[in-house]
């Protein structure tokens, strides 16, 4: 079961990268890791860095995937974004946000993608 879930997640990340590229984003990093965790995708468009969390689920509603991000995950994503900026010596005033690309895969193989800009904000 874990292998199947990992393959679905990897497939979803590849779909998200293609989607972002089609919408004018330049992918800066994929699966960026540090001791605190992983950022699925870091992309840039119009001078703004987007730290992208990809959520892939089976079903017909991408909202189900987006809704699976807990408060703890939101806090971790904020921390990871700050760690990425520091690790790459980017200025503190670098514009950035955390997006979610939610992907739903229906049983018929139809794919729905929802790109939620600034889905995670500081609280």
Curated annotation (Swiss-Prot):
Entry-linked Pfam families: UPF0102
Gene Ontology MF annotations: nucleic acid binding
Xref: InterPro entries: Restrct_endonuc-II-like, tRNA_endonuc-like_dom_sf, UPF0102_YraN-like
Annotated family: Belongs to the UPF0102 family.
Name of the protein: UPF0102 protein RoseRS_1723
Organism: Roseiflexus sp. (strain RS-1)
